[in-house]
Amino acid sequence: MKVNGIGLNSMDNEIRLQVYLAHCGVASRRASEELILSGRVSVNGVVVSALGTKVRETDLILVDGQPVRLEQKKRYIALNKPAGYICSAKDPQGRPLAQDLLPKDITERVYTIGRLDFRSSGLILFTNDGDFAAALGHPSAELEKEYLVESTVPVPDE
């Protein structure tokens, strides 16, 4: 079976778990490795913490207790984040999360591409497409970013 551009056949083909997670849109491959190392991923009921673990189409893969499937619909969401929200998926300080501003009908697990500070406002992108996120978010993409900064203090021309 070929799904989302990768060959994965339950009879003979296996792929590394972090690659599978990236293709499912859970996170980039590197971020998927961190999920695995932190014990947040299980395969067929067993928590996996070793990189390079191979999986098949028929395996039950959970991230934070939620099932992950290759057939997942890709989502791309642009949000004008207001100041006073954090871009992380969780905040130990209990501050409001930007993802909570997304429509409730978005049931897929999405995460931000890039970050804006808590006090900053502006465009932030959410997706469940790990390859897309890596292409935009990785420094090697060398994408230009533009910021408008307002200051109450005069800024010298130098």
Task: Give the predicted meaning of each segment.
Residues 2-158:
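Basic, flexible Lys/Arg- and Gly-enriched helix-loop patches that mediate nucleic-acid binding at interfaces
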